[in-house]
C-alpha cells in the first residue's frame, strides 16, 4: 500500500506536467519505470512493492510482480498488458566491448535492429557519447524501426538532463553570473550575445554539451517536432531515461526545468528505484493495522480503542466497526459502528475472511486507482 501510494504521487506529477506541456498522455503509463528490484530486501518484498507500482505504471523491471498479480488476482485478458519492459544494458555489458563506445553502440544496433532498447552511456565518457558518437550514428538510429533510449547513470540528474545553463522558455535574454548573455531566437535556438554600441550583438552558441544538457543535445542532433502547446518533442527514434538518485522532488525539478527550456515532459522517463520503494517504514504514510471491535460469545459488542492521556492525539485510534464512504470531499472514515448498522455504502470490500479468499480482477483495481487521481 505504501509503494502504491508513492507511485500514485509520481503518476499525479506525470499527469500534471503532461497537461502543461504535451498534446496527449500516451507516454504516462511508461514514464516511471520500476528499477527497484535489485535493491529490495527480498524477492517477496520486491513482488509486493512492484505490484503497487503497477497500479499506476506499466513499465517495470520487477518482472516477478507481474507473476504476483496473475497469482493473486483474477486472470486478465491475454491482450491486456499488466507490465512491460525492454532490453537494457548495464555497465558490465558496455565495458566488455572495450573503450570504444561507438563500436559498442554499433554492436547493439546490430543486435536490436527493431524495437525499443536502452543503453547506459556513461561507463567511460558520457558527453563524448552525446556529442560525438550519437551524431556519427545519427542516420542508423533514425532509420531504425524503433527507439534508442540513452541512459546516463551518474552526476546530478537535473544538470545531466537539463544542463547547467538555465534559459527560460519565455525570456529571450538571460545574463549569467559569468557575465555571458544568451539569446533565444524565435525558433528556440540558443545563441551567445554580447553588448555592443548598438545594443546586443548575436553570436553563435558556445555552450558545452554539459551546459546544454542531454535533452537539448539530442534535440540538436536528431530534431523532432513542436507540439500545439509550443513545446519540443524529440524525434520518435531517440529518447532518454534517468534512474539514478531519482526522488519525487528531483523528478519534479527535472520536469520543471525541461518546461522552462521549452521541452515537453514526454521527453524523459524516470527509473524509480529502491530508495523510493524500499527506504520506508510503517510511519512513512502513517499506516497501521488495529483491532477496533469485538463480539462476545453472548452477542455483546464492544468498541476496542486506545486514547492515551500522555499522547497528543496521534495514537488515538478508531473505535467500533468502521467503513469508508465516498463523499463530495473524497473518501472519509466512519467509525463507532456496530454489526447491525448499514454497510451498503462501504467502499472497502472483503478480499479475505475466515480462510477464504475473494479475488477481484486487477482491471477493477486499476479502474478504482486511476479514477481517484
Where are these regions (language model features)?
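Buried, small/hydrophobic-residue-enriched core segments of structured protein domains
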Residues: 1-228, 248-250
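Gly/Ser/Thr/Ala-enriched C-terminal appendages of enzymes
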Residues: 62, 68, 74-76, 97-100, ...
Amino acid at each position: 500500500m505504501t509503494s502504491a501510494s508513492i507511485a500514485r504521487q509520481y503518476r499525479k506529477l506525470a499527469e500534471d506536467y503532461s497537461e502543461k506541456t504535451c498534446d496527449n498522455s500516451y507516454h504516462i503509463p511508461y514514464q516511471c519505470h520500476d528499477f527497484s528490484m535489485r535493491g529490495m530486501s527480498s524477492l517477496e518484498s520486491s513482488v509486493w512493492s512492484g505490484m503497487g507500482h503497477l497500479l499506476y505504471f506499466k513499465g517495470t523491471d520487477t518482472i516477478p510482480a507481474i507473476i504476483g498479480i496473475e497469482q493473486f488476482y483474477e486472470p486478465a485478458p491475454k491482450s491486456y498488458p499488466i507490465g512491460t519492459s525492454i532490453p537494457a544494458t548495464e555497465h558490465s555489458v558496455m565495458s566488455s566491448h572495450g573503450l570504444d563506445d561507438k563500436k559498442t553502440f554499433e554492436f547493439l544496433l546490430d543486435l536490436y535492429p527493431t524495437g525499443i532498447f536502452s543503453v547506459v552511456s556513461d561507463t567511460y565518457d558520457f558527453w563524448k557519447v552525446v556529442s560525438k558518437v550519437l551524431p556519427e550514428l545519427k542516420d542508423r538510429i533514425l532509420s531504425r524501426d524503433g527507439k534508442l533510449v540513452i541512459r546516463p547513470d551518474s552526476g546530478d540528474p537535473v544538470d545531466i538532463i537539463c544542463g547547467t545553463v538555465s534559459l527560460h522558455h519565455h525570456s529571450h535574454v538571460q545574463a549569467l553570473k559569468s557575465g555571458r548573455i544568451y539569446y533565444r531566437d524565435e525558433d528556440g535556438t540558443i545563441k551567445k550575445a554580447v553588448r555592443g554600441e548598438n545594443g546586443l550583438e548575436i553570436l553563435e552558441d558556445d555552450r558545452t554539451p554539459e551546459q546544454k544538457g542531454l535533452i537539448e543535445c539530442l534535440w540538436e542532433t536528431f530534431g523532432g517536432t513542436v507540439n500545439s502547446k509550443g513545446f519540443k518533442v524529440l524525434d520518435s527514434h531517440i529518447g532518454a531515461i534517468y534512474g539514478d538518485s531519482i526522488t519525487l522532488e528531483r523528478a519534479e525539478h527535472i520536469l520543471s526545468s525541461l518546461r522552462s527550456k521549452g521541452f515537453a515532459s514526454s521527453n524523459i522517463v524516470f527509473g524509480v528505484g529502491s530508495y523510493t520503494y524500499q527506504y520506508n517504514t510503517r510511519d512513512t504514510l502513517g499506516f497501521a493495522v488495529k483491532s477496533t471491535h469485538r463480539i462476545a460469545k453472548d452477542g455483546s459488542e464492544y468498541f476496542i480503542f486506545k486514547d492515551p492521556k500522555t499522547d497528543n492525539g496521534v495514537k488515538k485510534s478508531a473505535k467500533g466497526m468502521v467503513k469508508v464512504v465516498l463523499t463530495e470531499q473524497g473518501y472519509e472514515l466512519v467509525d463507532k459502528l456496530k454489526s447491525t448498522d448499514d454497510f451498503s455504502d462501504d467502499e472497502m470490500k472483503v478480499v479475505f475472511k475466515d480462510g477464504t479468499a475473494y479475488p477481484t480482477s486487477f482491471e477493477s483495481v486499476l479502474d478504482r486507482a486511476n479514477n481517484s487521481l
